[in-house]
Amino acid sequence: MAYLDWLDRTLQAKLAEKPVGEPVALRFSLAATEDHGLLIPALARALSLASAWLGSRIERLYAMGSLHDGSVSVLAEPAGGQTAFVSSELSRGAIAVRLLLIGNHGTLIWEDSPGADGLKVDFRIEGRSEDQWLREALERSLESGDSEEVRRG
């Protein structure tokens, strides 16, 4: 199983217990080595996960940074009024995953360096159907320098 699929399954199970109440904000950061995929697909997948964890589809986003420099951050606005800040960067070091989920009754923090223990980790970035709409909005926002609506179908 790919790491991000495992993380999604693990976090969904934890969130079902309502440990933070209703999620209201999310900070999600991925630092992956260059051989694991491109920034835009990684960001689209991360935004799709953020949407699932917040329980609300992302309607609008603003991307900033540079593909050339290997670092892009996104401020996203889900339909439910929550806030998501997602970033992805290429790293010459180890893979790093950081997550801060803020709810109306607490916070959840997740930090991991998959593979740092020497075990092989499947860190493929596999796209989902929802990712395509997010990917297109990311590309438009980076090109325009402005926020963009996520246009579905």
Where are these regions (language model features)?
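Interdomain hinge/lid region at the active-site interface
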Residues: 94-125
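A contiguous active-site-proximal alpha/beta segment in oxidoreductase catalytic domains
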Residues: 1-36
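Rossmann-like dinucleotide-binding domain that binds NAD(P)(H)
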Residues: 26-96
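Short amphipathic beta-strand/extended segments with alternating polar/hydrophobic composition
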Residues: 84-89, 108-113, 124-132
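C-terminal helix-rich "cap/oligomerization" subdomain common to oxidoreductases
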Residues: 122-153
